[in-house]
Amino acid sequence: MPLSRLMIQQFRNIKACDIRLSAGFNFLIGPNGSGKTSVLEAIYLLGHGRSFKSSLTGRIIQNECSELFVHGRICEHSLSSDQFELPVGINKQRDGSTEVKIGGQTGQKLAQLAQILPLQLIHPEGFELLTDGPKQRRAFIDWGVFHTEPAFFDAWGRFKRLSKQRNALLKSAQSYRELSYWDQELARLAEQIDQWRESYVNQLKNVAEQLCRTFLPEFDIDLKYYRGWEKDQPYQSILEKNFERDQQLGYTFSGPNKADLRIKVNATPVEDVLSRGQLKLMVCALRVAQGQHLTELTGKQCIYLIDDFASELDSLRRQRLADSLKGTGAQVFVSSITESQVADMLDESSKTFHVAHGVIEQG
């Protein structure tokens, strides 16, 4: 489901742009600070409701403007197999308020936008997926579960709300009996979330490990899911057993909120073995594998956003990534300082856009 058209207004240094896009590769060429990353950021905002560079809305709205707009048209197929364009849009005010439009209807939810516009981001700091704590790897797993298990989003939201209530009760509870009622529902949700996550990782595992070996043939890659509490023990038993410790901490220590994807290379934690370039290549492999798996499972195509394509990658590794992306048949947006860095990827269906001072022109 590629974007056929993208309209951006008052976003960072982009005053206004309206561009027609390729369903294949779209190249954004320009020097640092030109606005090419802002185009990727705007697409990400359209699919996630937030920027990948700043959590502060005021920083992405153009100076002296009160709001920003990002609109797009998504190519869809109807039941009769006829193609049509679905208009989508997001408007953010400087006060942080957000309005989402889908098919011309206002008041839509961000989760609905994310569902119809699955995005994968690969950027220079992306290796943090492998080197930082488990939060990013949980988000990696949950991206896949969200797009393949319709009930996950509501279940995860309910689990987080109940966890917050439990943490508040921990401060005043005199005995575990005061929490047992809450913990029954919390445990039910935790077990369900764990089941979805484990099933997803088991399905993704073969695709991801195979693609990692294609990108990094010199290494043996292994992915393992950790659910966040002791294996083969019911979650409610864990909650009861750890009641006093949780009271001392002031929060619930174990649970789905501690889940992780543990990745090893040659039986050693990945961050202890790979160089920055190799880490980036592995992240690319994992992201592409997720997109491939999504297509195999649901028929949906995700959109890939790749910022600073040449960073940390030599020509051979760039070619491996390009070949894998072309093999997916997905829509891809690539930013690069020079056109020569992506020359081998250009074909008849691709489009090149030159970006300077926030102005985007097809070249």
UniProtKB/Swiss-Prot annotation:
Q: Please give the chief subcellular localization of this protein.
A: cytoplasm
Supply one GO CC term from the record.
cytoplasm
DNA repair: is it a keyword of this entry? yes
Q: Does the keyword Membrane apply?
A: no
Q: Where does ATP bind?
A: 30-37
InterPro entries associated with the record: DNA-binding_RecF, DNA-binding_RecF_CS, P-loop_NTPase, RecF/RecN/SMC_N, RecF_2
| Domain of life where this protein originates | Bacteria
Gene Ontology MF: a single term: ATP binding
GO biological process per UniProt = DNA replication; DNA synthesis involved in DNA repair; double-strand break repair; SOS response
- Signal sequence segment: none
Q: Where in the cell is it found?
A: Cytoplasm
Q: Which UniProt keywords apply?
A: ATP-binding, Cytoplasm, DNA damage, DNA repair, DNA replication, DNA-binding, Nucleotide-binding, SOS response
**Protein family membership:** Belongs to the RecF family.
Annotated function: The RecF protein is involved in DNA metabolism; it is required for DNA replication and normal SOS inducibility. RecF binds preferentially to single-stranded, linear DNA. It also seems to bind ATP.
The protein here is known as DNA replication and repair protein RecF
Q: What species is this protein from?
A: Vibrio cholerae serotype O1 (strain ATCC 39315 / El Tor Inaba N16961)
